[in-house]
Amino acid sequence: MMEVIDSVLGDRQSAIQLIDESKKFHQDALNYFNKCIDDRDVGLDYHVISVFGSQSSGKSTLLNHLFNTDFDTMDAQVKRQQTTKGIWLAHTRKVNTTHKLDGPASDLFVLDVEGSDGAERGEDQDFERKAALFAISVSEVLIVNMWEQQIGLYQGNNMALLKTVFEVNLSLFGKSHNGHKVLLLFVIRDHVGITPLSSLKESLIAELEKVWSELNKPVECEDSSLYDFFDLEFVGLGHKLLQAEQFQEGVKRLGDSFALKSANPYYFKPQYHHNLPLDGWIMYSENCWEQVENNRDLDLPTQQILVARFKTDEVAQEALSLFHSKYSGSVDHILDDREKLGEVLKNLKQECLIYYDERAYRYAEPVYLEKRSELAAKMEAEFRKTIGNFLDQLSESLMQRLQTEVLDKKNQHLPFQKRTKILVQSTKEEYWTAVSSFQQLELLRSTEEILQHFDEQVDTKIKQLKNDEVNTLIARANKSITLKVKEQAVHYLSNPERDTWDKILDMFEKTIQSSLSKYEISEGHYDFQVGFTEEENDSVYKKVCSRAWHVLNVTVHDYLKPDTIVSILRDRFETKFRYDEDDSPRLWRNEDEIDRAFRIAKDHALEVLNVLSFAATSDHVEIVPAFGEDNHEEDECYEDELGIQHSRHFAHILNELQKEKVLQQFRRQINLTVLDSKRSIIKTTTAIPIWMYLLVVALGWNEFVMVLRNPLLVTLVLLFGVGFIFVNKFGLWGPVLNVAHNAVAEVRITAKEKLRAIVMDEDEKRHLINSAGKESYEMKDMSDSDNEKIEKSE
């Protein structure tokens, strides 16, 4: 059962038995501490003091006089026996001092440890060792209470127990010594002054150093000294009964060192404190006792870290819950406003970190900072999502604007490379400004990945725009090249000569060069001003040329079909056959002249057949496209719908079979032309006999005279004769017949309408006559009835 001592002082809580004699830790210690501090923010401004010594040596009495506590004390007049059982804890802010303090002292928590070497426990030293270990683990100042006459003894002055304390201290702090110390305050009771305090001090120090030298130290602590882990102070107090005034005065002077920071010495030094907030110290002390009780290795720094981790994590979770409760509602409506978004996120982060700092900064600094960093990272992870959404919207907007401005006509006066460089720089600067603003507000820890991702987006967009620009450039160049190449190539092929292909090649190269002249930087080298490397520019040039060759290839092969070639040869033949050197029509006089002209014209026509069937220069070199128009991965020959084999090479226009067919058709057509010419000679040589003219004059003289005497008839005869000759010569009988047919049709339609009108007029007249008779009859009836009415009335 836990025992509780009722306090007789109104401003402090009763002492509690922190650890009972059954080695059980008080389960309601936290509630006791909360009552002691009364909701005040104590922070690290508290101190823990422990006392141990022999049983019935006046430990509790000393604490009650020094700190105004109410620990139970022994009544020596009744019986000397064990009074303090287990470890008791009391809280106080009142310390006995030589003069009145301006205000209450810091919160002091005093541990009264069960006395050692008691008859009640006998040889069972387990609890006293564990109690001493616990006291040194949790306290800043360890008061060693002893009598003057015990100095020089080994068991009597607790040197054996101190040896255990030293060994335990090395096991606790030796491996990871971080400057933490414990003050050993030796209070020598019943010091009557015969032996000077300095002499007693020297004796105790000598004994302590001897004990230290005999310790079994860990390897890493072999060279350590007593003073690396402990500070030593010595105080003498007079006899409580025989020297009551001196005792009280000594207690007050001792109180000055606990209450006054200006006192010399002042016992509460920073290196003594465990740097745990009060609620953390409670958890820490409970963990320490659990480790001690279970005989586990007690690593105090680790225990402090564990407590700090637990408490800081608890506070961090509270701060994070606060963050989540305010986050969504604060940012949803301002996602498109960078300044407001940054301000809201910054304020929310600061609010949560302040909440964490106020409650966690007192714990171990490395743990506090680590958890703070984790908390900030968790908030930044949420920020990253929100800021990421904002940056995605901004990125999309900037990409759209970049594309619009690159394609804007007002910027077209600048080369593509120059205008994209300017626009990309401004776009990146705007994005970088937005990202850096969030980073300056400490909302983004790292921006390298974000900026790298945006740069990749910009590069992708610029690459796309480059490709679009190049495709537009190629299309524009090919359009210009296509028009010129088709027109000029067809012209040259329609009027072939021996050097036709030389002219076509020269025209083709000049057309490409003129279309790309503004991009030419040197002979054969081009810069299309889109930021391409030399190899990429060369690739674009080759692509333009390749498409131009394709156009030429299609134009040539589509135009030079067998029928077209026959027509070209026939036109060439007829031009040479029908016209002389002055381009005047020939008048044939005899067949020999026709045969001679036929041979010349035929040879003239056939001399270009090879030109039209195979593309080669005048030096008989086959024309091969410079940029892969002939590089077919398929077979070099293919078969058309008629089963005729064709070559895929540019130069191969007609195969041998096609040439033979062209020759056959050509011969047939020119043979017909020759026959027509020879028929015209026969017609001109067949003349009308002279006697026939005389007979016509003799028999038709009267009619001839009649015509001459009638001018109108002469005029009509001349008009009709000229018209007849004109129509007959130009073959206009078809249009004349159409006009006559249309005129007759119009006359027929007009006649029908006139007849219809005449018939309609007759019908209308009859209808009017009938209508008039009926009306007169009705009027007569009405007049008769009126007369009858008049007669009746009379």
Swiss-Prot record:
It is found in: Endoplasmic reticulum membrane. One of its GO terms (molecular function) is GTPase activity. Its EC number is 3.6.5.-. GO terms for biological process: endoplasmic reticulum membrane fusion. One of its GO terms (cellular component) is endoplasmic reticulum membrane. It is a multi-pass membrane protein. Its main location: endoplasmic reticulum. Residues 331-352 form a coiled coil. Belongs to the TRAFAC class dynamin-like GTPase superfamily. GB1/RHD3 GTPase family. RHD3 subfamily. This is Protein SEY1. It comes from Zygosaccharomyces rouxii (strain ATCC 2623 / CBS 732 / NBRC 1130 / NCYC 568 / NRRL Y-229). The lineage of its organism: Eukaryota, Fungi, Dikarya, Ascomycota, Saccharomycotina. The gene is SEY1.
